[in-house]
Amino acid sequence: MAMWAMLAAPLIASCDLTTMSPDTLRTLRSAAVIALDQDADVRAGRPVDDNPEIWQRGLRHGVAVSLTNRDSHPRTMAVRLSDLDLPESTTFTDAWSGRAVPTTDGWVSVLVAAHDTVLLTAG
């Protein structure tokens, strides 16, 4: 769902909604991620520096960044704020949890679970 939001694509569930797990339903009903997907700036995101694991998407009032871990184990992923054309004073929010994600020395760094995507917003 994170990449759907980064691509500003329609959010379509092609499963029986009456039998989905509570976790799946919670994911599909995430107000923050739906708002990101339906942001007024409808341009799709793009990879940062041709890195297929880190994407950036302009929003009407900010920016979204996704970090995707394709590995089979958790790993820390980071991106320089200058690569995102953002000032060092930028602070992020995790779109799934609503928690603040600090930046350090011009970098944003997060632990990403195996085969998962962290979705951050700023602005």
Task: Show which residues each predicted segment covers.
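Hydrophobic, well-ordered secondary-structure elements that form the walls
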Residues: 65, 92, 115
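Membrane-interfacial catalytic/cofactor-binding modules of polytopic membrane enzymes
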Residues: 24, 30-63
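Aromatic/acidic polysaccharide-binding cleft in carbohydrate-active enzymes
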Residues: 1-39
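Structural beta-strand/beta-sheet cores of well-ordered domains, especially the beta-sheet scaffolds
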Residues: 2, 9, 32, 52, ...
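Extended, solvent-exposed regions of the mature portions of secreted/cell-surface glycoproteins
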Residues: 77, 93, 106-108
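Solvent-exposed beta-hairpin/edge-strand motifs
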Residues: 82-98
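C-terminal beta-strand-rich structural cap/linker in extracellular carbohydrate-active enzymes
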Residues: 102-123
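Carbohydrate-binding surface patches
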Residues: 4-7, 12, 48-86
